[in-house]
Swiss-Prot record:
The protein's role, per its UniProt record: Catalyzes the reduction of arsenate [As(V)] to arsenite [As(III)].
PANTHER family (UniProt xref): ARSENATE REDUCTASE
SUPFAM superfamilies the record matches: Phosphotyrosine protein phosphatases I (SSF52788)
Protein's gene: arsC
UniProt cross-references to HAMAP family, sorted A to Z: Arsenate_reduct
Family per similarity comment: Belongs to the low molecular weight phosphotyrosine protein phosphatase family. Thioredoxin-coupled ArsC subfamily.
Protein name: Arsenate reductase
Catalytic activity field: arsenate + [thioredoxin]-dithiol + H(+) = arsenite + [thioredoxin]-disulfide + H2O
SMART domains the record matches: LMWPc
Pfam families xrefs: LMWPc (PF01451)
Lineage, highest ranks first: Bacteria, Bacillati, Bacillota, Bacilli, Bacillales
The enzyme's E.C. designation: 1.20.4.4
Any one GO molecular-function label of the UniProt entry: protein tyrosine phosphatase activity
Organism: Macrococcus caseolyticus (strain JCSC5402) (Macrococcoides caseolyticum)
Active site positions: 10 (nucleophile), 82 (nucleophile), 89 (nucleophile)
GO biological process: response to arsenic-containing substance
Amino acid sequence: MEKKTLYFICTGNSCRSQMAEGWGKHILGDTWNVYSAGIETHGVNPKAIEAMREVGIDISHHTSDLIDQDILNNSDLVVTLCSDADNNCPILPPNVKKEHWGFDDPAGKAWSEFQRVRDEIGHAIEQFKLR
């Protein structure tokens, strides 16, 4: 069976979408191709890398990328992770489903916020797998 494509989008492709891509590949990698991107690029946040390393997932090789129209238009599901991305997501073809899963932005906040948001994203992806 061909894998489906899941595209996580947030503002800067720095924290939330990077962690979601890491979790997604870890949890859904056998059935989904998982990517992430941003409306802008802010670089991968080192604390996001460290937070994911803490749960055994390596995202240190990830890059901060702008939305790729080819991936976007060929996705089965696009998930926005912040209201900015939800409001500014490009128009999608009718075959692409879109969902919004809002998470707080941990950037510039305490380490515990990175851990909390990381765990919330992981839980959401675990729940998604059960659908």
